Amino acid sequence: MLQPKRRKYRKEQKGRNTGIATRGNAVSFGEFGLKAIGRGRLTARQIEAARRAMTRHIKRGGRIWIRIFPDKPISHKPAEVRMGNGKGNPEYYVAEIQPGKMLYEMDGVTEELAREAFRLAAAKLPLKTTFIVRQLGA
């Protein structure tokens, strides 16, 4: 699963996920893309599950790019532990997603195959997404 190799600090504050994606919002590598319309968090497990769904569908053909990386640690306190006594330990990592962010890209396959692969991947994600075709000259 995806997670940072090392971090300067183990824990991070919650923060607020606001605004729209101004970077990483265009198809840059492939011909087709899966773009987020909604806002939220994607865990490393969700990113991997969607990648597997796409890879299985396109079989040997094509190439997939993952345009997001889970770099924010989410901490949890153990069950039945009293309040206080500091912050919990990091349990998993998430990627904060703003509307307009490109999540995955694909190349080397037909549009129908890419559309179906992205539909299967989108079913694994807790966000609303849309299918994007690269525009010429963009």
Curated annotation (Swiss-Prot):
Presence of the UniProt keyword Ribosomal protein in the record: yes
Intrachain S-S bonds: none
Entries under Pfam families matching the protein: Ribosomal_L16
Any single Gene Ontology cellular-component annotation: cytosolic large ribosomal subunit
GO terms for MF: rRNA binding; structural constituent of ribosome; tRNA binding
Keyword Membrane part of the UniProt annotation: no
Region (Disordered): 1-20
Feature: compositional bias, Basic residues: 1-13
Keywords (A to Z) from UniProt: Ribonucleoprotein, Ribosomal protein, RNA-binding, rRNA-binding, tRNA-binding
One record GO biological process: translation
PANTHER family assigned to the protein according to its UniProt record, in alphabetical order: 50S/60S RIBOSOMAL PROTEIN L16, LARGE RIBOSOMAL SUBUNIT PROTEIN UL16M
Family: Belongs to the universal ribosomal protein uL16 family.
Oligomeric form and interacting partners: Part of the 50S ribosomal subunit.
Function: Binds 23S rRNA and is also seen to make contacts with the A and possibly P site tRNAs.
Protein name per the record: Large ribosomal subunit protein uL16
Species of origin: Paraburkholderia xenovorans (strain LB400)
Upper taxonomic lineage: Bacteria, Pseudomonadati, Pseudomonadota, Betaproteobacteria, Burkholderiales
